[in-house]
Design a protein with these regions (language model features):
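Ligand-binding pocket scaffold of soluble enzyme catalytic domains
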Residues: 36-38, 42, 47-51, 113-116, ...
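Conserved, mostly hydrophobic/aromatic
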Residues: 49, 68, 102, 115, ...
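Glycine-rich, aromatic-flanked loop segments that form ligand/cofactor-binding clefts
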Residues: 103-143
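Shared catalytic-loop signature of beta/alpha-barrel
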Residues: 22-23, 79, 214, 220, ...
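Motif-centric detector for short Cys/His coordination patterns
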Residues: 1-41, 57-62, 69-77
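Metal-dependent enolase-superfamily TIM-barrel catalytic cores that perform enediolate-based chemistry
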Residues: 128-245
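Metal- or metallocofactor-binding catalytic centers and their adjacent structured scaffolds
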Residues: 5, 45-114
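Flexible C-terminal active-site loop/helix
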Residues: 2-11, 15-18, 29-31, 37, ...
């Protein structure tokens, strides 16, 4: 089997009631606003008629595919390891995000060729995954605008069945307000719900990170993630922070690549390791990170929701929660369009069962069917490689 053609459609969809924060870059709740979001729909065609599909990515990843798209033509689509290493070298001067946009549909293609879900190819066994509610950033527009609002939403999520809840705080934060919020959420849900905090690298100083971390200590949080404006990449800074607080750190969302992830973990910069199938070389790259992390005796936590993440998590032992990201008490938006699916697959606040879990799609490949009519109706740009 050989790759004959690759097509990437850029489709745009409206995201309602969200806008960029005026003093930062977070998407925050703003009633009446509309924000255009893009999705990159990839199809990899072969000479035997098998097609691999995936919708996701970002503009940086799509631009990088231009650097290796034609190299893929004529290649065996099952030789993912060869493709991974060749493309990794080609993108060595860049962040390598383009790798994931091609690797994921190659796994979908393999699953479709053999008539099994990706998790079966990976030796996976899980059929349901425990999820955590990962909030949108804090706003000042009547949504997540106070400690009480975060606490009330945590209770709502617990009642829906979520076993864990992660806060993303305000761009215009105040340390005492963040500290109050950390405590208020714990007081509201009690001791039997895992809680996490992700400031999204917003805290201005290391001192603020220490103050917030010690509040997490007092409230018994499971982890603190990407606290301050080093942007999550300072091994020395996070190693020192680990020495000053008890709450485990979850880092490496903003560190690219297998070797860099493991250097960060071995160097003592984190307790949990973050991996992302889109950011870290696709399913192939994220799986390498998961296995290497397992060899260190640590857990890996996958970033963001989606069918690729579900197939991957179903195949990894050393992982805890599926991230149901961008949930909000007054919106069904999750930061990416759900209109791309044709088969009822969805992510979002109410996408979990009463057991607090999401199902792993059991169809071939990624296990989902895309609505290509809807995608093409929203397409604004197409690239092809032959």
């Amino acid at each position: 089997m050989q790759i004959e053609r690759i097509r990437i459609d850029k489709a745009t969809f409206d995201m309602r009631d969200f806008a960029k924060h005026p003093t930062g870059f977070s998407l925050v709740y703003e009633p009446g606003s509309r924000k255009s979001v893009s999705a990159y729909a990839v199809r990899i065609y072969t000479d035997e008629g098998v097609v691999g599909e995936y919708v996701g990515g970002n503009s940086i990843a799509a631009a990088q595919v231009d650097m290796f798209g034609r190299y893929l033509i004529g290649k065996d689509p099952f030789q993912r390891e060869r493709i991974y290493n060749d493309v990794k070298r080609q993108l060595r001067k860049f962040d390598k995000m383009g790798m994931g946009l091609i690797d994921i549909p190659l796994w979908d293609l393999a699953g479709r060729a053999f008539g099994v879900p990706v998790r079966t190819l990976l030796g996976g066994w899980k059929t349901r995954l425990p999820a955590y509610a990962s909030t949108a950033a804090g706003d000042r527009s009547g949504g997540l605008d106070s400690a009480a609002a975060y606490a009330d939403f945590a209770v709502q999520c617990k009642e829906l069945g979520y076993r864990a809840y992660k806060l993303h705080v305000w761009d215009d934060y105040d340390v005492p307000e963040v500290v109050r919020t950390i405590a208020a959420v714990r007081d509201a849900v009690g001791p039997d719900m895992d809680l996490m905090l992700d400031p999204g690298c917003k805290l201005e100083t290391f001192a603020h990170a220490v103050q917030v971390g010690r509040a997490c200590d007092d409230a018994g949080y499971l982890w603190l993630e990407d606290p301050y404006k080093d942007t999550g990449v300072s091994l020395q800074g996070h190693r020192r922070l680990r020495e000053l607080i008890r709450t485990p750190l979850l880092q490496t969302e903003h560190v690219r690549g297998l070797e860099q992830h493991i250097d960060f973990a071995v160097g003592g910069g984190t307790d949990f390791v973050r991996a992302d199938a889109e950011y870290d070389g696709g399913i192939t790259g994220a799986l390498k990170i998961a296995y290497a992390t397992e060899g260190l005796g640590l857990d890996v936590e996958l970033h963001t929701p989606g069918p690729a993440q579900r197939q991957l998590m179903a195949s990894i032992r050393n992982t805890n929660y599926y991230e149901m990201s961008f949930v909000h008490p007054k919106s069904a938006e999750i930061g990416r369009s759900q209109a791309v699916y044709a088969d009822g697959y969805r992510d979002g606040l109410t996408a979990i069962g009463a057991d607090g879990c999401v199902p792993v799609p059991d169809g071939p490949g990624l296990g989902v069917s895309y609505d290509w009519d809807a995608i093409e109706a929203h397409t604004v740009e197409t690239r092809e490689y032959r």
